[in-house]
């Protein structure tokens, strides 16, 4: 009888190496936060208060930072808003702590950007709007001379900002939006990912000419398939040119509720799974603080950052020996503060032990009225279902992995 060769010994690592290794990038510092492939993926968001309202802006920045936004962006549409950033930064330091801040600058914004650069850690510009080209209805072509004149105007306008940021050791985001490409980009490339990439490249090459590389790039669109194509193309194009700048990921105008979260998870999560992306912002039409758990959830699902307990639970079926949904909620309520643990709650022994083999602890339906507790793959004890949650807590305590929940937490 023919026999098969013995397979290689299984890896001892609980998780396989990613199919796509992370895209190598430079490191860019935004205040005390480092963005790039050698560092954890950074979560950020943006306040929606008017920057001229100093107290409201400071409170909003603090709320976001406390919620887990490691970098906070503010809109700076005028010179008055730019000057207000000095007071905002000062009050943050006095009443809270320094927070890495990004100023969002758009239409013909060079004077605003130069002013605000001294008060923030990063300036974000939109290439489609920074040197605004007045559209000409009925235009049928751009001459080479016209294109060269626009490029020269961009270089002349943009270079002082690059030099200022370089001198101050600040960062820049070249943030392209699919919905605001310049007219000539639309004329040459259409409303396409190619136009988005070329729009960013035009500005990035000026940065490289000035030997300024504290640059982050983004290529956002409201449709995940467009942003996916743009980021993939950008990774190939920029890396081929040696401009391996970090990428800021996001689906802009994702909407609200469940569908907004799904769109963000599809767009951001797909790229992260491919090794593309170094900082993320989930954009929801909701209070900005609600974006943060979604962002960390995406990172946890991909095993990129662990900020909560990982619960493994089956969907339930006719073999389930207890109310799985109810028990999962009880287990979660008792253990959700034990960040770093993987806990499985499985309804029966058919798939339970195998499906939860890489969990730290398992709670599995054994026979009617009884459950088994596991430590990894090892069955530790069988207890009445009514004692299951407390027995799980005692097992975790016996292993020295229990900590008391913080005061006021749901686990307390």
UniProtKB/Swiss-Prot annotation:
- Recite the UniProt keywords alphabetically: 4Fe-4S, Iron, Iron-sulfur, Isoprene biosynthesis, Metal-binding, Oxidoreductase
Q: What does this protein do?
A: Converts 2C-methyl-D-erythritol 2,4-cyclodiphosphate (ME-2,4cPP) into 1-hydroxy-2-methyl-2-(E)-butenyl 4-diphosphate.
* Pfam (any one): GcpE
Residues reported in the UniProt entry to bind [4Fe-4S] cluster = 314, 317, 348, 355
Q: Which GO terms describe its biological process?
A: isopentenyl diphosphate biosynthetic process, methylerythritol 4-phosphate pathway; terpenoid biosynthetic process
Q: Does the keyword Chloroplast apply?
A: no
UniProt lineage = Bacteria, Bacillati, Cyanobacteriota, Cyanophyceae, Synechococcales
SUPFAM superfamilies named in the record:
Nitrite and sulphite reductase 4Fe-4S domain-like (SSF56014)
Catalytic activities = (2E)-4-hydroxy-3-methylbut-2-enyl diphosphate + 2 oxidized [2Fe-2S]-[ferredoxin] + H2O = 2-C-methyl-D-erythritol 2,4-cyclic diphosphate + 2 reduced [2Fe-2S]-[ferredoxin] + H(+)
**Quick one: which pathway?**
Isoprenoid biosynthesis; isopentenyl diphosphate biosynthesis via DXP pathway; isopentenyl diphosphate from 1-deoxy-D-xylulose 5-phosphate: step 5/6
Family that this chain belongs to = Belongs to the IspG family.
Per its Swiss-Prot or TrEMBL entry, what cofactor is needed? [4Fe-4S] cluster
Task: State where composition is biased (Polar residues).
Answer: 1-12
Protein name stated in the entry: 4-hydroxy-3-methylbut-2-en-1-yl diphosphate synthase (ferredoxin)
Instruction: Name the gene behind this protein.
Output: ispG
User: Which note does the record give on the cofactor?
Assistant: Binds 1 [4Fe-4S] cluster.
Q: Which organism is it from?
A: Synechococcus sp. (strain JA-3-3Ab)
Gene Ontology terms for molecular function? 4 iron, 4 sulfur cluster binding; 4-hydroxy-3-methylbut-2-en-1-yl diphosphate synthase activity (ferredoxin); iron ion binding
Region named Disordered: 1-22
Give its E.C. classification number.
1.17.7.1
Q: Which InterPro entries match?
A: Dihydropteroate_synth-like_sf, IspG_bac, IspG_bac-typ, NO2/SO3_Rdtase_4Fe4S_sf
